[in-house]
Amino acid sequence: MNLRSVPGMYRSIQELGEIFDREDQAQKLVDEFTEFYNEYKQKNEGKDHPKVMILMGLPGSYIIATPNSYVGSLVELAGGENVYSDTDQEFLTVNTEDMKTKEPDIILRAAHALPDQVVEMFNKDFAENDIWQHFDAVKNGRVYDLTYEYFGMSATFKYPQALEELQPILYPESDADTQKAKENSDKAQKDAKDSGASEKYDEIQKSK
């Protein structure tokens, strides 16, 4: 199964349809995706593609998500230009000085595991590490947290919600879009804090 991108997920569905003699059902799903994406893509035709940097947060650290990762593929589907696209790896470990040279228009922050810890880590680092204050994306208020249920490590059928969330972030055409992007980011951060993921993880560890 190729779950690193939405198209990859649907290619896998087609392959499984052939294996299990379910070609018609598989093709129906593929056709639904094609119709959805063609309509979505038309909304952004002719628009400038913003430069985007994606931070995938882990407890205690973060890495860069490239277009070869699922989150990166979603941003690419939405028309964003990943500033770390010249690689065949899914994720990169990069220092903030190198990130600064890329000058992204937008910084997206996603959480892989224990989202409650990750959002606190991001907030602390962006507040205390002075270099972030020199990024144009930070100066311009274009740093956004993403809903962890939509922007994980593997493709899911929640990609329409993910693309809808990216729309006002990448292409704000009005004050209402800018406000919506901020509200979505605030909600994503609140949901992460309220997830109770760390507590659940501790309970699992204690039960072993």
Where are these regions (language model features)?
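Alpha-helical, coiled-coil/dimerization segments enriched in small aliphatic residues
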Residues: 63-92
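Extracellular/periplasmic catalytic domains that process cell-envelope and extracellular macromolecules
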Residues: 45-48, 76, 100-102, 135-139
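Acidic/His-rich segments in extracytoplasmic proteins that coordinate ligands and/or metal ions
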Residues: 1-19, 94-134, 168
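Short, solvent-exposed loop/turn elements at domain surfaces
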Residues: 60-65, 109, 116, 152-155
